[in-house]
Amino acid sequence: MGKKPVVIGVAGGSGSGKTSVARAIYEHFGDRSILVLEQDFYYKDQSHLPFEERLRTNYDHPLAFDNDLLIEHIHKLLRYEPIEKPVYDYKLHTRSDKVIHVEPKDVIILEGILVLEDERLRNLMDIKVYVDTDADIRIIRRLLRDINERGRTLESVIEQYVSVVRPMHNQFVEPTKRYADIIIPEGGHNHVAIDLMVTKIRTILEQKSFL
C-alpha cells in the first residue's frame, strides 16, 4: 500500500482564526510538503440563477457548499493527482470561470466553517481541529474582512450577521466542536497548541514514512 497524505480539518466560526492556524502550521512545514484547501472556494455554482436570487444565498448553511466536488478533489490529492480548484466570485455571488491548479502535497489542511459538519469529510481526516474564539472578536474580524476584501457595506455585514451568521453558527458550526480531536482557543495566537499540532503531524508523517 502506497503512502497517503495527512489530512487535517480546521473548523470554527467565521472570523475565529482558522486561516491563522492553517498559516501557522504551513509555516512550520513550508510549501514543499503542505497545501491549504479552503472550503470557501467550494461554494456551489449559481450562474444559472438570476442575480437577485443569488443575493439571498445563505453562505453559512451546509447546503451552500459543493462538498461532492470538494470530496472528489481530496480523493484525487490522496492519490497524488493534481486538481483544478474552483474560484468563487463574491461580488457576482457565483463561481468564477477561473480555476487554480493545485499540486498534491504530503499534508493537506482543509479549512472552513463547516468542514467537520459532513461525515464524509470527517472520515477523510487524520486530525480534526476546532478553533474556538469569542463571538465579539469573530464579528469584528468578519466586518473587516467582508468590507475590505469582499466589497460589502457595513450595514449589509451587520444585517447578515444578525439574521444569518449568528443563528447558523449556533445551529451548524458550534455543534461540530464535538467532533474535534483538538480545540484551539485564540486561534493562531495560541502558540502552545500550534506547537503540539505540529509535533502530532510530524509523528503521523513519520508513521507514514514521509520523514
Curated annotation (Swiss-Prot):
Top enzyme class: transferase
Superkingdom field: Bacteria
Main localization, broad class: cytoplasm
Biological processes per GO annotation: CTP salvage; UMP salvage
Binding site for ATP: 12-19
Keywords from the UniProt entry: ATP-binding, Cytoplasm, Kinase, Nucleotide-binding, Transferase
GO molecular function: ATP binding; cytidine kinase activity; uridine kinase activity
UniProt-listed Enzyme Commission number(s): 2.7.1.48
Localization annotation: Cytoplasm
GO cellular component: cytoplasm
Reactions catalysed: uridine + ATP = UMP + ADP + H(+); cytidine + ATP = CMP + ADP + H(+)
Pathway stated in the Swiss-Prot or TrEMBL entry: Pyrimidine metabolism; CTP biosynthesis via salvage pathway; CTP from cytidine: step 1/3; Pyrimidine metabolism; UMP biosynthesis via salvage pathway; UMP from uridine: step 1/1
Xref: HAMAP family: Uridine_kinase (MF_00551)
Protein family (similarity comment): Belongs to the uridine kinase family.
Protein name (Swiss-Prot/TrEMBL): Uridine kinase
